[in-house]
Design a protein with these regions (language model features):
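Alpha-helical transmembrane segments of multi-pass inner-membrane proteins
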Residues: 65, 102-135, 144-217, 226-240, ...
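Long extracytoplasmic/lumenal interhelical loops at the membrane interface
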Residues: 261-275, 283, 287-333
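Hydrophobic transmembrane alpha-helices and their immediate junctions
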Residues: 168, 213-214, 223-225, 332-372
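Transmembrane signal-anchor hairpin modules in multi-pass inner-membrane enzymes, especially those
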Residues: 1-79, 95-111, 163-180, 222-226, ...
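Interfacial transmembrane-helix termini
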Residues: 14-31, 45-51, 62-87, 97-105, ...
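A membrane-periplasm/extracellular boundary helix in multi-pass inner-membrane enzymes
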Residues: 195-196, 216-261, 273, 278-283, ...
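Loop-to-helix entry and N-terminal half of a specific, functionally important transmembrane alpha helix
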Residues: 6-13, 54-56, 181, 185, ...
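Transmembrane alpha-helices of multi-pass inner-membrane enzymes
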Residues: 30-36, 209, 341-344, 364-376, ...
């Protein structure tokens, strides 16, 4: 009975987590509580222990807990550690109960949610409805900021396209409704990416587009040629037809060309954050400062720099996030933290590459590459929507339950 209830709840989670943080959190907590009280804990823990990726997630989470021993601000550290519950608790739990036979249903529910997001975005763009909180007509990203929205929509494009690649002509004829739905999601989400201001999403879309060609034609010159040509065509078509995309590309070139004023740009501020984060890492190379201490350590170094160099005058004195998860882990958990994070990705790709299903193998590799790239530009493993997105895919596709 509990299995059926959790199956239904995860169907709801698959649909609601891209639309609502509150509902996503509520559903995952209920699923976890039911899992705990549904019995057969010994069997469940055995399944978790046998899954190398689940254990890699737990190791990374436990390192956060251990680092509380040397952090100076215990309560801030506790708050940071809570943001890693997806890795320490939720992913292992989901890996122990999700059944392979239900995976397609969960993915379909996710794509329906993507369809609602895209449709809402178009309605905002064409001024048929008022912009939702945080979105504008020029940046129609409902339910979340463009930092997370655009990569998620790009992944929606990839998933629907990969579904279409796996369908032969007979299955398309037999299930016309599903085929039409997938084509709609693929085309509408592809266009929608260039209607937003999410530069990270642009990069992810181009990466996923290339991967689709390699997954369709194999690793050969044809796939390389088609991916390069298609990216070039899409780039210039988007540049000529999308004012938002054009503006973001031009602003990026303007910043790089006007290097003397780079510190006042978003790119310049990120470079300064990176510089200070590396200083913190060098001072605490092996184990880091401990989770939760980054903001205070950053502030100390920034105040010194402001006294010695006027270019830092207009830069914010503190930040909780250096806009790179790797820099944050390096500063807070040191070289050991980077090793644990590296092992997490290693386990992800190792299990992906040995997966028996080509469909799941392709998606796992693509999701892994996406999050490897995304975490350079921001701390995507800390955001509610983005961490749930990663949780969703790895829990489904790395589950070994029949």
């Amino acid at each position: 009975m509990f299995g059926q209830i959790n199956h239904f709840l995860f169907l709801l989670f698959s649909f609601f987590f891209p639309l609502s943080v509150a509902l996503g959190n509520l559903l995952i907590i209920i699923i976890s509580v039911l899992w705990l009280f549904s019995g057969k804990l010994k069997e469940k823990f055995h399944l978790i222990k046998a899954n190398k990726f689940a254990m890699a997630c737990i190791y990374f989470f436990v390192l956060h807990i251990i680092s509380l021993l040397w952090t100076e601000d215990f309560y801030k550290g506790l708050e940071r550690t809570k943001k890693m519950l997806e890795f320490g608790i939720y992913i292992p739990i989901l890996l122990s109960f999700i059944k392979i036979k239900n995976i397609e249903k969960y993915l379909t529910m996710f794509l329906i949610s993507i369809g609602i997001m895209v449709l809402t975005s178009y309605l905002i763009f064409f001024e048929l409805i008022a912009p939702t909180k945080g979105s504008t007509i020029n940046d129609p990203t409902p339910f979340m900021s463009h930092i997370t929205y655009t990569p998620m929509i790009a992944i929606g494009f990839y998933l629907s396209s990969r579904f279409l690649l796996s369908m032969d002509s007979i299955s398309m004829k037999n299930n016309k409704a599903m085929t039409i739905f997938l084509v709609f999601i693929s085309i509408s989400s592809f266009i929608n990416v260039f209607m937003t201001e999410g530069r990270a999403g642009y990069v992810i879309l181009f990466i996923l587009l290339s991967l689709l060609f390699f997954q369709a034609f194999g690793t050969n010159l044809k796939a390389i040629f088609l991916s390069i040509v298609s990216i070039a065509i899409v780039f210039f078509a988007a540049y000529l037809s999308s004012p938002t995309f054009k503006q973001k590309i031009q602003s990026t070139f303007d910043v790089t060309n006007n290097f003397s004023n780079i510190q006042n740009s978003s790119i310049g501020k990120r470079l300064i954050m990176a510089d200070i984060s590396i200083e913190i890492f060098k001072e605490n190379f092996l184990f880091g400062t401990g989770v939760g201490d980054f903001e205070d350590d950053y502030k100390k170094i920034m105040l010194k720099k402001k006294l010695n160099n006027e270019i830092y005058t207009d830069i914010a004195s503190s930040t909780k996030n250096p806009h790179s998860f790797y820099l944050l882990v390096a500063a807070e958990l040191g070289f050991v933290g980077l090793l644990f994070l590296g092992y997490l990705f290693f386990a992800h790709f190792k299990l992906a590459l040995t997966h028996k299903s080509m469909f799941k193998k392709d998606i796992l590799i693509s999701i892994g590459i996406c999050f490897l790239a995304l975490n350079f530009s921001d701390s995507y493993f800390l955001g509610h929507f983005s961490s749930f997105l990663y949780l969703f895919f790895v829990s489904l596709l790395l589950s070994e339950r029949a």
